Structures are given as C-alpha cells and as structure tokens.
Amino acid sequence: MMKRQLHRMRQLAHTGSSGRTPETAEFLGEDLLQVEQRLEPAKRAAHNVHKRLQACLQGQSGADMDKRVKKLPLMALSTAMAESFKELDPDSSMGKALEMSCAIQNQLARILAEFEMTLERDVLQPLNRLSEEELPAILKRKKSLQKLVSDWNTLKSRLSQAAKNSGSSQSLGGGSSSHTHMATANKVETLKEDEEELKRKVEQCKDEYLADLYHFSTKEDSYANYFTHLLEIQADYHRKSLTSLDTALAELRDNHSQADSSPLTTAAPFSRVYGVSLRTHLQDLGRDIALPIEACVLLLLSEGMQEEGLFRLAAGASVLKRLKQTMASDPHSLEEFCSDPHAVAGALKSYLRELPEPLMTSDLYDDWMRAASLKEPGARLEALHDVCSRLPQENFNNLRYLMKFLALLAEEQDVNKMTPSNIAIVLGPNLLWPPEKEGDQAQLDAASVSSIQVVGVVEVLIQNADTLFPGDINFSVSGIFSGLAPQEKPNSQQVSEELAPVAVPATAATPTPTPAPTPAPASMTVKERTESELPKPASPKVSRSPTDTTALAEDMTRKTKRPAPARPTMPPPQPSSSRSSPPALSLPAGSVSPGTPQALPRRLVGTSLRAPTVPPPLPPAPPQPARRQSRRLPVSPCPASPVISNMPAQVDQGAATEDRGGPEAVGGHPPTPVLPPQPRPRGLISETD
C-alpha cells in the first residue's frame, strides 16, 4: 500500500507546470493537450468574473421587477424628491424642476432594474454554470481517468512480477513446488482478469474525457460571447438612460426658458476677472489696463499711500473675498473698500499671482535673470530696458502702469515704511516666477536663488521707473472710477502760514541759582564730618542731542500699546526752531531751602534734564583751634583744603552743567578732578582735643 502511494506521489511530482500528466498525455494529441491546459484558467476566470459582477448589482438578486425596484437607491432618491416638492409651490421654478427630477429618477430606477435582470439571465447564470458545473465535470472526469490509468499501470507491474515468479518456480521443480506453482498460476490468472477489467474502464473513461474536451473546444467561442454580451447589455442600459435624461432636460429647459429671459437673469453677466489670462481679460472687457490693477491703484492713491506696511500686512480673508467678488460683479461699488487699503493691496497681489502667465512673461524669464546678474549698474539698466521693449504690448502697458504707481508709493517711504526693496520683496514673486518644471532638489534650490534675482529686478524697475518707462501717466484710464481722486500732498508753505507759531520758552539764557551750602550739625564728630565730606561716585553721563532725545521718547511711546489715532488729513507742521531745554521749575513759597536736593516728578523723567556729573559743593568747615607744634617734629604749614579752594569753581561748573547739558559744553575742557580731604594725623587730633 505504501509503495502505491509513493508511486502516486512520484507521478504527481513529474506533472509539469503546463498541466500535462503522464497518465493522460499518452492518450491525447497535441491539439487536445492545448485544450486541456485551458480548462483550469477558464474555470478560475468564470468564477472571479461572476463573483465581482454579482457585487455590482444594486437590487435584490433573483427578485421580481417590483421588489427589485423598491430596493434600488435611485428609487429611494425619487421618493425623497416626491416628498420634498409637495411642500413647495408647484408653479415655482424650483417646484417644477424637483417634480421633473423625481420622475426621471423613477424612470432611471426601472431602467436599472431591467438591466440587472437581463444581466443575471444572460451573463451571470451562464458564467455560474460554466464555473460550477460544466468545467468542474470535465476536470472531475480527468481526475478519474488519471486514477484509472495509475491503477492499471500498477496492476500491470504486479502481473509482470507474478508471471516472473511463476516462471522461476517451474524451473526449480520438485513435489512440494507443484502446489506453489498452482497457487502462483491462479494468482496470475486473477491479475490478468483484473487487468482486463481496468483496461476496459480506462478505455471507457478515456473516450468520455476526449468527448468532453471536444465539446469544450467547440463551445469555447460561445463562452467568450458571455463577456461580449455583458458589454452589449451595459451599452443598451446607458443608451436608454441617456435618452431619458436628454428628453427630461429638453423639457426642463423649455419650462424655464421664460425664467431665464427675465430681467433679473439677463443682467450684466458675471465676468471672470481672476485666473484669466491678461490678453483674454483685456479683449473681453475692451480695456488697455486690467480692471483689478486700475481699480486697486486708484483706491490706494485715494486713501492708502501713507498706510504703514502696505502690501506687507495681510488683510482679513472674508473682506478680501468680498472685494474680489465685488470687483468681478460690480466694479462701480468699490468705493466702500477705500477704508481698508490692506484688503485692496491683497486683491492686487492676488490678481497678479493668479494670472496663468506672469505679468513679466515666462518667455523672457531667462532674459530677466541675465539682466539681473550684471554687476555694472549702467549695463544692467540698459539690459532691463531692452527686455522691457520686447514685452508684449498689453504686458508692457500694465507693467508700466504698475511701476509708475509703485514709484509713487516708494516716495512715501518715510511714512509707510515701504522702500523699493521692501516693495520688491513682497511683489516680486507675484510679477515673475520660473516656469514649472518637475525636478530634483537642485532645481528647487535654483528656483529659490532665482526668486532673489527677481526681487533685484523689480527693485531696479521701481527705482528707475521714470528712465525705463518715460513720460507722464494718467492713472484713471477708463474713467469709471471718477469718484476716486488721488490724495494731494499739502504745501508746506501753506501749512506753515495756516498754523499759528508756537512760542517755546528759552531757559538756556537764564542762569540757575546756585544752591547755598548747608551747614553741618554741631553734634557731628570730626571723623563723621570727614567721611561726609568725601565725594560720592557719580553715575556716568551720556550726552545726547535734543534730536536723539526726541527720537528716543518717540520710540518708547511707539513700543507701548495705545489705541490707533485717527488718520491725519495733512502732515504735521515743520518746527521753526530747534528744541530748547524745558523751563526751570519754580519752588513754591515756604518750601525747603534751595540747598536741599529735590526729586523730579515722574512726568519730567525722559526729558532733557539730566543728573549732574559733579558732586554737590561741600559745606565750609568750622574754625579749628590752632595746632600745637610738636617739639620733635618740624613745624609744617597747614595747606588750605582743596575742597574749600575749589568750591566756587564747582558751583559755577554745576550751574553751567545744568544749563548746557555738561561741563564740556561750557568751556570745551574736561572738569578738574576734585581731591578728597586728607585725613589728619591721629596724634594731632588727640592734642587738639
């Protein structure tokens, strides 16, 4: 038994990948062998297609027409529409459209149900029979033939072995071997009968298998027609659906033809402005300058040239969206956006960026880059002029218009903080960008470098707008924005005449009285008096001019949070004279003596008053008794105290410091260093006491 199984495994192992088996290959010709190889792939194909096609059905499989239609999603949609248009006015356009849509969805659902029923009958069921009945029967008969052939071969090998054993027993002879010979002969006869029976079965199974192969080869074309019929059914379904949709659409358009021709719907069409090429936009509207460019420029010229951070600060998304819609639908009502110059600047940048081709054209991109790479200013300017002359006429006109405006904007850089460099940084990438090419990181790096060169090109165009684009320009080209007038710069002479002169009190000529020295209390000892007379270290003084002080005060004021003031209508008047120091504070009657230092109020901190760099004058020392001369030491004259001798100079110097900001401003020489009082010898103190 184990030998038979091992032999069977060997036969299966010898079966090639082509599907040929040694049991059946000897009975089949070359044509039938090829047909046999197509059995397994055909069975798998029919099974997979049937499974996936069954999943595409939307209705209930095997149900009748009415049940199938109720389960379709299109029928559910039709029911929802029928319930919805009952609440609407049947004479309204929406009610009529919804009613028509409900009817067409119901019709499409029935067409779909018919399509699925035909698909099941003509495609799904034949494919199921082919994959589950016909081809499995042929493959089953093939396996039976293989088993019979294997058993027949095994029986033949046993028969040959038994015949060989019977011949060897006859050659040996003997009485005892006669009985063995008879048993062997009977076994051989039995094996011959079994072999004849198996041979008959093999022949019968072989004939049936060959007939199945011939039948499959003749019906293989009809099996292929299943897939052709599938496409025909689908085409017929879509054709019927399209016919129904065309009929419904024609009827729906006829019903709404009067509504479409009403005055409300025949108003000025919603013209496309953003995202359209410049040439198409100009041809459709019959303009020389693009509508967004002219409208935004006039809005900014009206109110916005002195807005700080223009084109750099972003506007609100909702305001910008509403502005773009208004510009496309009703450009005459744009004056309401004058109060938001940042939204207007954002709309201009958005238009330039959404152009299919940049305003400075992609065809001249390399020429712009070559002109920007020139180091010599004259050569670079000449190259840029040459590239500008090769622009298309509509691009040149709009670029000239825009550069003239940006040059005017740069003239207000002291107020709006937008220099030509800042304007080029924020607008350059919107005027010119490299052509889109799919590449590696190296090309991306090159694009970033080119953006820097684009900024350089735009900056030079702004700085030399009068040279590259000579002649004056009228910004109101179309005349539809007549209500937007550019801001007129006020004349400085008229402003100075209208404003009254402001008198500034000059305190520099009035000398500040020198505080009188305060006498020390009598109870203070000599040592304490000596320590109190020592000069204290003064804080370092930083000399600032009145202009620097004013700038510092304005900077500190700018850093603090404060509500935005109303926008001025004219620039502030120019100061007629330089600022002078504030007037000296007058002491009220009954206050402390002038010698006592007073603290300044907080409102004066940060003004031109500064702390003196020279210490206050020391009080005069009380008269000391004459020292007794020591007998051992020579008599030495007592020098006068340097503090006492220098006191008048210090007083004068301090007064000059307060008036003019420092001792350097009085005489132009640094002050003489003050020597501290010298300590007296301990022996002399004791003798004096």
From Swiss-Prot:
Pfam families per record: BAR, RhoGAP
Modification Phosphoserine occurs at: 241, 262, 539, 545, 586, 641
Main subcellular localisation: other
GO cellular component: adherens junction; bicellular tight junction; cell leading edge; cytosol; exocyst; lamellipodium; nucleus; phagocytic cup
SH3-binding (motif): residue ranges: 611-620
Domain Rho-GAP, chain residue ranges per copy: 276-469
Listed Low complexity bias regions: 576-594
Region feature Interaction with CGNL1, mapped onto this chain: 1-275
Keywords, sorted A to Z: Cell junction, Cell projection, Cytoplasm, GTPase activation, Nucleus, Phagocytosis, Phosphoprotein, SH3-binding, Tight junction
Keyword Phosphoprotein: yes
The keyword Nucleus is annotated on this UniProt entry: yes
Residue ranges of domain BAR in the record: 17-262
Biased composition (Pro residues): 565-575, 613-625, 670-680
Biased composition (Basic residues): 1-11
Region (Interaction with CD2AP): 470-689
Site for Arginine finger, residues: 312
Modified residues (Phosphothreonine): 596
GO molecular function, a single term: GTPase activator activity
Annotated region (Disordered), positions in chain: 1-24, 507-689
Entry's Gene Ontology BP terms: actin filament organization; cell junction assembly; cell migration; establishment of epithelial cell apical/basal polarity; filopodium assembly; negative regulation of small GTPase mediated signal transduction; phagocytosis, engulfment; positive regulation of GTPase activity
PANTHER family, sorted: 3BP-1 RELATED RHOGAP, BARGIN-RELATED
Subunit structure: Interacts with RAC1. Interacts with the exocyst via EXOC4 and EXOC8; required for the localization of both SH3BP1 and the exocyst to the leading edge of migrating cells. Interacts with CD2AP and CGNL1; probably part of a complex at cell junctions. Interacts with CAPZA1; recruits CAPZA1 to forming cell junctions. May interact with AFDN. Interacts with PLXND1; they dissociate upon SEMA3E binding to PLXND1 allowing SH3BP1 to transduce downstream signal through RAC1 inactivation. Interacts with ABL1, GRB2 and SRC (via SH3 domain).
Stated role: GTPase activating protein/GAP which specifically converts GTP-bound Rho-type GTPases including RAC1 and CDC42 in their inactive GDP-bound form. By specifically inactivating RAC1 at the leading edge of migrating cells, it regulates the spatiotemporal organization of cell protrusions which is important for proper cell migration. Also negatively regulates CDC42 in the process of actin remodeling and the formation of epithelial cell junctions. Through its GAP activity toward RAC1 and/or CDC42 plays a specific role in phagocytosis of large particles.
This protein's name: SH3 domain-binding protein 1
Originating organism: Rattus norvegicus
Gene: Sh3bp1
